[in-house]
Amino acid sequence: MRGLHGQDLLRRPVRLRGIQLGRVVDLILDAAGTRVVGFDVLCGDGTHRFLPLSAAEAQPDQIAVRSALSLLDAAELTFYQERGTTLAALRLEELDDVVLGAGGEVRERVPRAGGDSPGS
């Protein structure tokens, strides 16, 4: 994941051996907003599921998984959303994007252009 912008991961397909299971719709970060812990994936059946970062491999054109069982149900997604933050929430507050290091750590916070906050 070295040097990837968070927004570049949004809408990226999640695939198992070339079969699309869903698309990334948000990044889930720890409570401090310093490390990505996983992804909110909108699956083909219309259900949002949690994909832990440790079970995912970011590739140039997809997020690859080794098993469909890596996509956890809505209860786990809610658990991580409630105890952490999301890229969408950070973008509402003060940021335009984040740049991620190889282990999912936030290496850089990209401020909103002009420093404007929502509603300004």
Predicted features by range, described:
Residues 1-120:
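Peripheral interaction segments used for macromolecular assembly
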